[in-house]
């Protein structure tokens, strides 16, 4: 049961919906069908999700008129979960959505993000946002020795500013520094990249794909 305040005109709902990959997905979907306000759907690209049929996923979301936008979020390993999904697998899954023949009746946020990155309008660094932890401290996303994400707590805003200033050199490898998308790629938080064998969390492969597709369309329309 939703609080009546959620049904006011200036509200919209953000719903995590991973289809059958998450418990009680049928109940979540039924609630989405009954929602009188717009819904922004977030899908976590877990191993179960990326194995699903994309055309069927789009068809089901199209059937829910309240869904106005859909974003596929990459899975990042942490202390609680360690699913095996590579960055390259995430890229390939998003490409399936981009190439799907079923028309989307909703806004596909990932497409917008790709366009913003290619236009160098997206800031990939953490200098424009900061988290507040349950302990009342400032928080930034860091990665431990096993490359699992965690929140690093900072006592003061000055400490956060110092951390953000050091991020481009401390958290970014030579692979990142030599990349043409550096500073504007699709990463939510920079992490150390050793090589591009399985892609990177800036999703260079996805940006390369989109740029090539754009050039191909331009040539075919010339």
What name fits each language-model region?
Residues 1-77:
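Radical SAM/AdoMet-radical enzyme domain recognition
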Residues 145-222:
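Flexible mid-to-C-terminal extensions adjoining Fe-S/redox cofactors in radical SAM and related proteins
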Residues 25, 54, 86-94, 172:
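A structural signal for well-ordered alpha-helical scaffolds and beta->alpha junctions
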Residues 7-9, 124, 173:
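A short, structural micro-pattern
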Residues 25, 51, 80-82, 189, ...:
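Short acidic, gly/pro-rich beta-turn/loop elements at beta-sheet edges
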Residues 44, 109, 188-191:
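Acidic carboxylate-rich catalytic motifs and surrounding loops in phosphoryl-/glycosyl-chemistry enzymes
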């Amino acid at each position: 049961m939703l609080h009546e305040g959620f049904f006011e005109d200036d509200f919209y709902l953000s719903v995590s919906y991973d289809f059958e990959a998450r418990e009680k997905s049928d109940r979540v979907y039924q609630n989405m069908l009954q929602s009188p306000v717009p819904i922004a759907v977030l899908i976590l690209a877990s191993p179960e999700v990326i194995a699903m049929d994309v055309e069927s996923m789009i068809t089901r979301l199209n059937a829910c008129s309240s869904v106005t936008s859909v974003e596929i979020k990459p899975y990042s390993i942490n202390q609680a979960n360690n699913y095996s999904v590579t960055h390259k697998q995430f890229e390939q899954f998003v490409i399936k959505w981009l190439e799907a023949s079923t028309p989307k009746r909703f806004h596909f946020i990932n497409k917008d993000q790709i366009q913003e990155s290619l236009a160098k309008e997206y800031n990939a660094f953490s200098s424009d946002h900061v988290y507040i932890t349950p302990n009342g401290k400032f928080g930034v996303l860091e990665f431990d020795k096993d490359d699992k994400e965690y929140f690093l707590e900072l006592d003061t805003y000055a400490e956060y500013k110092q951390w953000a200033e050091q991020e481009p050199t401390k958290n970014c490898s030579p692979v990142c520094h030599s990349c043409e998308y550096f500073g504007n790629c699709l990463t939510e938080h920079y992490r150390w990249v050793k090589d591009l064998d399985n892609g990177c969390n800036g999703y260079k492969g996805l940006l390369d794909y989109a740029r090539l597709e754009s050039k191909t369309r331009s040539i075919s329309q010339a």
